[in-house]
């Protein structure tokens, strides 16, 4: 199987560890997104796959073979960089076909692959231009075409859309998925953009400070976050995190308490005596001005108008919380009542920051 396996991989630069004991299997033919903030180790991980960086410890397997000592040029990968890395003195066609000519493929094969890539990525009529005569979006498509024609077993993309405007990024995301559906290569795609990750990926590997935080489908990363970092990083506005106290079926925020459903009581009781944090997404909060003794009471601080929705910032016992609402008749200093949707909340161990509902075998 043409899969990639990281076995206890670490990478350090001097005393700085940028990837920490990474264990990860990238399945044959999938689109895996390596997502995370700047400095999390995602690009270093990709460069180790490409052979541009050597791991400090651990082993990398590609197609069942350890490749720690295999040179980059012998790994059968195609890579697209953030800065395109086009040869400025070559035409579009020459840039796209350069690697094919180096490997001495027959001219007919080269011409066929060039035509397919040019047609697919809408580069018709640009074949004789130099990179300086192209827009940023066109240069990006040339870089993608160059990787497509190589048809390596593994397609590596390092922040490939970060230099494009929003409209071009949306189009390019669809083109990348289309390319994958045609060639069925294994895609490993690095980005800091959660929209790209959610729309392009079959699975997301979320990293932070060199550690793998969660590996799962986009839906599960969003709806079933493994830990507080995942809950806050995925989604905008970010998930609200509030420290709570639990006692005999009641969940307290400061001096206010409400009873919680039995399913959550049983799960909390199984954890023993631990501190808890409540996580709830802004879009899963409902606010009302009607007094409700079974809800938390807060005060509206300010409201943001997003055009199609509203962001309502309110305060509960000194904690700032944001709710996203379709319609809003609230104003600053209004008293509001908030009852969590217990089917949508997340409870985390305050010390480990791991979800108490996350399957232990996946931790």
What are the residue ranges of the model-derived segments?
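The feature captures the beta-strand-to-loop junction immediately N-terminal to the Walker
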Residues: 35-37
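Helix-to-loop junction immediately C-terminal to a conserved catalytic motif
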Residues: 50
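Non-catalytic connector elements of ABC transporters
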Residues: 250-363
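Conserved coupling/switch loops of ABC nucleotide-binding domains, chiefly the family-specific signature
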Residues: 56-59, 109, 209, 345
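Conserved ABC transporter NBD signature motif
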Residues: 58-66
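ABC ATPase nucleotide-binding domain
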Residues: 5, 25, 61, 337-339
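ABC ATPase nucleotide-binding domains
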Residues: 31, 72-82, 86-229
């Amino acid at each position: 199987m043409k899969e990639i396996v990281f076995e206890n991989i670490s990478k350090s630069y001097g005393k700085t560890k940028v990837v920490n004991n990474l264990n990860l299997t990238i399945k044959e033919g999938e689109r895996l997104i390596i997502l995370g903030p700047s400095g999390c180790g995602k690009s270093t991980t990709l460069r180790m796959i490409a052979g541009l960086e050597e791991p400090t410890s651990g082993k990398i397997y590609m197609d069942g073979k350890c490749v720690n000592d295999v040179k980059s040029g012998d790994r059968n990968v195609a890579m697209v960089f953030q800065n395109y890395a086009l040869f400025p003195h070559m035409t579009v066609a020459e840039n796209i076909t350069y690697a094919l000519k180096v490997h001495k493929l027959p001219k007919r094969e080269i011409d066929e692959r060039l035509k397919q890539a040019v047609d697919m990525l809408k580069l018709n009529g640009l074949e004789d231009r130099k990179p300086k005569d192209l827009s940023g979006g066109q240069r990006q498509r040339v870089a993608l075409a160059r990787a497509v024609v190589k048809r390596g077993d593994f397609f590596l993309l390092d922040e490939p859309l970060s230099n494009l405007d929003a409209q071009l990024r949306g189009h390019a995301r669809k083109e990348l998925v289309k390319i994958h559906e045609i060639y069925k290569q294994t895609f490993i795609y690095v980005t800091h953009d959660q929209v790209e990750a959610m729309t392009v990926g079959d699975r997301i590997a979320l990293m932070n400070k060199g550690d793998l935080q969660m590996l799962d489908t986009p839906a599960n990363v969003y709806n079933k976050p493994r830990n507080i970092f995942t809950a806050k990083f995925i989604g905008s506005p970010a998930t609200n995190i509030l420290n709570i106290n639990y006692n005999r079926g009641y969940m307290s925020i400061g001096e206010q308490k409400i009873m919680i459903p039995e399913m959550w009581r049983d799960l909390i009781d199984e954890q023993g005596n631990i501190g808890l944090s409540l996580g709830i997404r802004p879009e899963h909060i409902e606010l009302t001005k009607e007094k409700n003794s079974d809800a938390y009471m807060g005060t509206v601080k300010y409201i943001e108008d997003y055009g199609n929705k509203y962001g309502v910032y309110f305060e509960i016992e000194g904690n700032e919380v944001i709710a996203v609402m379709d319609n809003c008749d609230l104003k600053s200093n209004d008293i509001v009542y908030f009852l969590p949707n217990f089917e949508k909340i997340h409870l985390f161990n305050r010390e480990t920051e791991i979800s108490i509902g996350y399957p232990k075998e996946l931790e």
